[in-house]
Swiss-Prot record:
Keywords: Membrane, Transmembrane, Transmembrane helix
Subcellular location: Membrane
Membrane keyword on record: yes
Record protein name field: UPF0154 protein SAG1601
InterPro entries, A to Z: UPF0154
Gene source species: Streptococcus agalactiae serotype V (strain ATCC BAA-611 / 2603 V/R)
Ranges that cross the membrane: 5-25
Family: Belongs to the UPF0154 family.
Amino acid sequence: MSITIWILLIIVALFGGLVGGIFIARKQIEKEIGEHPRLTPDAIREMMSQMGQKPSEAKVQQTYRNIVKHAKTAIKTKK
C-alpha cells in the first residue's frame, strides 16, 4: 500500500478512537453523577442552616431524595 493510504488509515483510526473515548467517558460520568450526586445530606443540612432554617432529618432526607430523583429523570429524558 502507498504511504498516503497508511496516513489516512492512521488519521481515521485516531479520530474514531477520540470520538469513541469521548462518548464512553460521557456515559460513565453521567452514570456516576446519577448514582452519587455531588450534594450530600451533610451539604444540604449545612445549606439549610446557613439560610436560617432548622434542618430536621426528615426534611434533609426528603430534599436529598428529590435531588437524586431529579438527576435520574434528567438523565433518562436526555437520552
